[in-house]
Amino acid sequence: MIVGPVKVRSACSHHLCPILGRVWIGLLPNEFSNLIGLSKYARICDWIMSRPQIQEEAVTMLADELQTRVKPDGLAIVMEADHFCMHWRGVKDDESMMTNSVMRGAFLKDANLRREFLSLLSKKNGG
């Protein structure tokens, strides 16, 4: 199952500039997983992203929270975000995006499952 893209907003903890992005969540539940409602994924993303932080930490915190709550056999998270510190400071580059991923369980161990998840994201984004 894939949930996303979920729009997220945060602030860079280094510069306190906005971070605007999207998150995709892949889950491979099992018979013992605690499935949550679809809107809860967006709420958890919003809760995690509501504090200043760096993107790498946010993705890991989101993975930890979902792993604890849902207990799936596999968990995959991809986050793509625009960092306004890149627009407003230093290089003033308004085209670069940062992408991070976390793969756990079956998504980490099974290359075919991981490839399927990433290819479905690519198709959703016109790739």
Identify the residue ranges that each predicted region occupies.
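A domain-level signal for the structural core that forms small-molecule/cofactor-binding pockets
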Residues: 1-127
